[in-house]
Amino acid sequence: MALLHSANPADQIIVALDGMAPDQALAFSVQVEGLRWVKVGLELFVQAGPEVVAQLREQDLRVFLDLKFHDIPATMAGACRRAAALGAELITVHACAGSEALNAAQSAAMEGAQSSGQPSPTLLAVTVLTSWEEQRLQRELAISQGIAPRVSALAQLSATAGIGGCVCSPWEAAALRAQHPEPFALITPGIRLKGAAVGDQARVMGPAEAMTAGATQLVIGRPITRANDPSAAFNACCRELRT
């Protein structure tokens, strides 16, 4: 299903439930008034199991399942079929898995959703993780290609394979949006409010800047989840997007 840019700031923000125990994640999701989207990552999924997706959906939340599948085509297809059957509406796969695996994953996800009566999901290709810096990418992985051209190439590979969007740093959003107009989705982590700590993200940007650059939705974790008042922090992000 095509994921179109929403004018509602609450729909533009996906809150990452990283670092939370299952009961904390479920309680937090109820606590933040106006919350529409949450991200379930590896840590929470491994601890809570697939049922956490159903539990969050019972709270009328939409789920971004960020497990970054990267395997042979048959395995990726099976995983994406199961993920879509759970009701996850955004599902991540690694673009580096290649076109055959991406094609298989896309087809299987649609089959899984349809057979289970769930919403049609949007698969998102992971290009270059926002924790990478160019020099370290070259030093540790022997990749001489710069981050920007590598992201561009992987996004093009994904779009050609029928994937509905990609995860990218906000710093790559403008260039990718110029190459891939909507409904191709651009989901950007690495979002920080002014004055907030950067943490382990190397390529960050403010919410309004990222949306202006072409992002469809923003993934925001610690600036909201670790705030003294998460609801106030969420509302502050929404206000920034309205300006």
UniProtKB/Swiss-Prot annotation:
Catalytically driven reaction(s): orotidine 5'-phosphate + H(+) = UMP + CO2
Pfam families tied to this protein: OMPdecase
Record PROSITE patterns: OMPDECASE (PS00156)
Keyword set includes Lyase: yes
Gene3D superfamilies reported in the protein's UniProt record: Aldolase class I
InterPro entries on file: Aldolase_TIM (IPR013785), OMPdecase (IPR014732), OMPdecase_AS (IPR018089), OMPdecase_bac (IPR047596), OMPdeCOase_dom (IPR001754), RibuloseP-bd_barrel (IPR011060)
UniProt-annotated catalytic positions: K68 (proton donor)
EC number annotated for this UniProt entry: 4.1.1.23
NCBIfam families on file: PRK00230.1 (NF001273), pyrF (TIGR01740)
Entry-linked PANTHER family: OROTIDINE 5'-PHOSPHATE DECARBOXYLASE
Record text on subunit structure and interactions: Homodimer.
HAMAP family attached to this UniProt entry: OMPdecase_type1_B (MF_01200_B)
Job of this protein: Catalyzes the decarboxylation of orotidine 5'-monophosphate (OMP) to uridine 5'-monophosphate (UMP).
Protein name: Orotidine 5'-phosphate decarboxylase
Species annotation: Synechococcus sp. (strain CC9902)
Organism ancestry: Bacteria, Bacillati, Cyanobacteriota, Cyanophyceae, Synechococcales
